[in-house]
Amino acid sequence: LEEMKTIQNVNFKNTKALIRVDFNVPLNAQFEVADATRIVSAKPTILKVLEDGGSCILMSHLGRPTAQESEFSLRHIVSTLEAILGVQVLFSINCVGDEAQKASENLQPGQVLLLENLRYHAEETKGDVGFAEALSKLGDFYINDAFGTAHRAHASTTIIAQFFQENKCFGNLLAQEIESIDKVMQTGEKPVLAILGGAKVSSKITIIDNILDKVDHLIIGGGMTFTFVKAQGGHVGDSICEDDKMELALEILEKAKAKNVQIHIPVDVLAADDFSNDANTQIVDVRAIPENWQGLDCGPKSKAIFHDVVQQCKTILWNGPLGVIEMETFSSGTIALGDSIAEATKNGAFSLVGGGDSVAAVKQFGFEKKVSYVSTGGGAMLESLEGKILPGIAAISK
């Protein structure tokens, strides 16, 4: 992405910027915003347009409505959005049609208009061209700032871009996401380390395949560990294991060897006699887990080895926890890894955390400010790591 079109190179004076944001935020029982991270992330893009003397028309989805259920209305987020932006936010009860059109026409420079949930219309997720065109009429410049949906070819994220010949670009957040992934996958300072945790080998296979060409070290942790251990003849007791993926695990080890990538798998684990926070536990060799016991976190030797690997590396990608972090007893491996990454980052390494569970872990244990970048897009991040060209990104680059 040598010449990325970003908002920094555009002056939005007297421009109506139609911005696809990702305001798919969790709401509590009172329909108040429970976690405003995604709204805060969109702020720089919105403020840049307003400061230039333009106006903003914001479009987003919220949840997966099947009809126009009021619980999925974006009206619920208006007060939070106003507090974060520090400006009044106008609201349109539909995202297309006369009302939206009128609201957009009356918009003055410096004003912000939020459109109702895009997914109230089935055409959004179908990538309907007519719907995309109707949305495109609301603004004269299109900005995509929604990394969380960049891997979907939806009307507002991809199809709409064709109606803006030159007048389209990436927002701040999306540009940062692309640059961070680029740093790991292409331009990062070596040695490059990827840490993949989580339960299933099957969900990470394509990623592992793609990144073996880009990394020098690969740490495999979490539930995936046991498929690799058992494939090499170890005894994993009752630990989670995908027997049908053992061949694949051996192939990965072979490939890594051929490409000179060092793979690090836990050597010891904290095993439990039950899947519960109050289970009896013992530290055992990863290849000799007793019958009826299961490994639920990595052990002290593994933590020390992983710490050393992390300190050697200059570019670090972390995706997925190393243990069952939902239970305090089995969260220390993940916390230790977070500490190691924080230390390496302080010493000048670039660290990117992304993809579902690891983002939750980083927040839960307070590492958010101690790593270089936390990606907001779960699926989108994973698909980029798999080497896929995301449709939302391709549409702007055209």
Each PLM stretch: what is its role?
Residues 1-398:
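Active-site loop-to-helix "anion-binding N-cap" substructures in soluble metabolic enzymes
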